[in-house]
Amino acid sequence: MIKELEEKNLLTESDGCKIVNLDKYGLPPALILKSNSSSTYITRDIATALTRKRDYNFSKNIYVVATQQKLHFEQLIAVLKEMGYEWANDCIHVSFGMVSVKDDLLGTSAKLSTREGNVIFLNDVLEKSVEKTLEIINERNSALENKETVAKEVGIGAVIFQELFNTRIKDYSFDWNNVLNFEGETGPYVQYSAARAYSILEKNDFYSKINNLDISKLFNYEMNVDELALVKSIYKFEDILLDSAKKYEPSILARYITEVAKLFNKFYNSCPINNQEESIKDFRLVLTYCSRLLIEIGLGLLGMDTPKKM
């Protein structure tokens, strides 16, 4: 790779070091070799990018690295462009902000930083979350079957959702009171909404009837305000997925799933299913089914489970 840079007349000597001038990009020069001829991070990243393209012929080469490394990746991409590689534009820096904590795991609120020694291991966070979730389950529903499994699904999911709900480039504070809140814009809230939907469907024996349900009979159903709002939100799912993927922004999906959960709960509270005419009951069961299915798919894309009971 160094030889290629030399052959393309891209290396310039500066104070005994070898650099690539990036003035045309409005960037400081990229340090390729130190004065003792040792390599740098960007040297190794250039070589790695070349190897990945050769071995995998990637369509996108995505670097998920903290915002603080923005300049580094701007220089990396600029050097690849200077080397004449059009695929340099397919190298994407997906940056993210910092996390501070308010918890006895660290004892103080501080930015997580390996260099400063302010570190929590992810396994410790996940184990703590599962432990706290099990305590909540024992307080609220101690008779729940498989509660240890549910605690794991909800506890781990809560941490994932908290991370992905926040816009990725923004710093945020990790607080157990928010993460494990069953009533806020959280993973447990969304998972509980899906469990509620499953309970309704199970009580009405919906899953055994679904294959014989004549959906065409529901086409002329006149929806009320809450039903229509939920249907409109569900209809946006495909566009939300495309937008989230295009922008490398999982928070778009996480916030959308939360919106659907809120609208479903509003529908649940205002639109009774039992003791209704058959057409009304069938429509509301189908809408409940679609809501749960959407939440389950959405959470799955975020790496979360969807418990049937909570």
Where are these regions (language model features)?
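Non-catalytic interaction-recognition regions
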Residues: M1-M310
